[in-house]
Amino acid sequence: MGMSSLKLLKYVLFIFNLLFWVCGCCILGFGIYFLVQNTYGVLFRNLPFLTLGNILVIVGSIIMVVAFLGCMGSIKENKCLLMSFFVLLLIILLAEVTIAILLFVYEQKLNTLVAEGLNDSIQHYHSDNSTMKAWDFIQTQLQCCGVNGSSDWTSGPPSSCPSGADVQGCYNKAKSWFHSNFLYIGIITICVCVIQVLGMSFALTLNCQIDKTSQALGL
């Protein structure tokens, strides 16, 4: 019974992490592509590293490293790798909870910083190609114009701005989009946390099962 439980846990955890490793590779690949193509540009000039490409590369790399530890730890029945996998998942989970709390506590300050960053970047639209790409992408996708409206463009709105007198500014449009999709964002966030907790549970259970099997075999 002990050996069959060990094998089942081992392969469940291996397949679980293999799927996430493949997902990590895909995310990393998209991130590298966006970095090379510089498709979406830089929106916040005071945070030049905060681009879609960089975020995807970091997230993809973290997923790949954690999933690799989980794969190798489970298939090799290596307690050290399994505990490393467990600890990394725990650190990531705690970091996510901390970030969520900070975002909630400092929501007003964050809103102010975002508005200031957008107002600053819009001044460099014509002088910085990367900023131009970022603004063109956002205005096209959200069907908005400027930070608070088309009047933000002192020299006239660019072609990426939709026409019409009732066009919203991108700051309020982005906030509206976030609030209208808050339920879906919350569900996705909860699912990610549940998956992480499941991964930690599998790793800890497999680690304990390895101990029990070793004791039963007299190792």
From Swiss-Prot:
Induction of its expression: Expression rapidly increases in hematopoietic stem cells during stress.
SUPFAM superfamilies membership: Tetraspanin (SSF48652)
Subcellular location: Cell membrane; Cell junction; Membrane
Segments on the Extracellular face: 33-54, 107-181
Molecular function via GO: identical protein binding; protein-membrane adaptor activity
Topological domain ranges for the Cytoplasmic compartment: 1-11, 70-80, 207-219
Pfam families associated with the record: Tetraspanin (PF00335)
Disruption phenotype: Lymph nodes of cd53-deleted mice are smaller than wild-type mice due to a marked reduction in B-cells and T-cells. Cd53-deleted B-cell progenitors have diminished IL-7 signal transduction resulting in altered gene expression and increased apoptosis of developing B cells. Mice have largely normal hematopoietic stem cells under homeostatic conditions but they display a prolonged cycling in response to stress. Cd53-deficient myeloid cells have also a reduced capacity to undergo transendothelial migration.
Glycoprotein among keywords: yes
InterPro entries named in the record: Tetraspanin/Peripherin, Tetraspanin_animals, Tetraspanin_CS, Tetraspanin_EC2_sf
Glycosylation sites: 119, 129, 148
This protein's UniProt keywords: Cell junction, Cell membrane, Glycoprotein, Membrane, Transmembrane, Transmembrane helix
Topology within the bilayer: Multi-pass membrane protein
Principal localisation: membrane
Keyword Membrane: yes
GO BP terms: positive regulation of myoblast fusion; receptor clustering
Membrane-spanning parts: 12-32, 55-69, 81-106, 182-206
Recorded GO CC terms: cell-cell junction; immunological synapse; plasma membrane
Its job: Structural component of specialized membrane microdomains known as tetraspanin-enriched microdomains (TERMs), which act as platforms for receptor clustering and signaling. Participates thereby in diverse biological functions such as cell signal transduction, adhesion, migration and protein trafficking. Plays a role in the activation of monocytes and B-cells. Acts as an essential regulator of B-cell development by promoting interleukin-7 receptor/IL7R signaling. Also promotes, in B-cells, the BCR signaling by recruiting PKC to the plasma membrane in order to phosphorylate its substrates.
Family: Belongs to the tetraspanin (TM4SF) family.
PANTHER family, per database record: LEUKOCYTE SURFACE ANTIGEN CD53 (PTHR19282:SF39), TETRASPANIN (PTHR19282)
Subunit structure: Interacts with SCIMP. Interacts with CD45/PTPRC. Interacts with IL7R. Interacts with RBL2 and PPP2CA.
Entry protein name: Leukocyte surface antigen CD53
Gene that produces this protein: Cd53
